Amino acid sequence: MHVKLKKKFGQNFLVDKNISRKIFNLVPNKITKIIEIGPGIGHLTDFLLNDNIKKLTLIEIDSDFLPTLNEKYKKIKYIEIINQDIMNMDLSKYDSESIIISNLPYNISSQVLVKINNYCHFKMMVLMFQKEFAERLISSKLNNLNCLIKCFYEIKKEFNISKNSFIPSPKIESSVLTFKKKDQSLLENNDINLFSIFKSMIFINKRKKISTILKKNKFKLDNLTHLDMRAEEYNLNEFVSLYKKLKPELINKFS
């Protein structure tokens, strides 16, 4: 590693080739377009080079890595290197058949995941997170982190990664998760912003009963059920159903 790592970018680069190979093996053979967020100097990228790939987009915020990436992949015509912050990009222009792969920076994992999910048209993602963060995502209990993305994706934990597989080593283990787009989403894309407001309102008071939260926010409780439960006691379908029943009032209050 010849480039100085920057703490502000939360850089921990995967250098274990066996793990990189396992990650690539999660990519279906039919995939021809890949977007990698945060390639660094290409440790994982090297394993994504394949005869099936027609387009490989590398999005790297740190300009210090560009000379290495440009030199390393200058002869590969299907690679596009973009020096930009993923948080400032319009992802709608990318083909929904593309697969997103990333070892997401630990310090902005949540923000990047929300950003990607706001487009929610990608068929599949393979993402690495800190193990504790990953456990919250795959938890069977609803929480403020997982309830929106589970409306659009099936999430599966594939394997854990030792902290020794990275440079510099993070403090805890990581996990690789796959996200596969549901055939039938539980929400429409235009519900995302309003549902995000709703879930935040509920989960910021997660220890309180739903009835208490709704009364506090002056919602009508007529024809609503399961109000004596807490948010984490709902299953996903019940929670979405509650949102849809309250949607007219939510629109009036927050739109």
Please name every model-derived segment.
Residues 1-201, 241-244, 253-255:
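Catalytic cores of RNA-modifying enzymes
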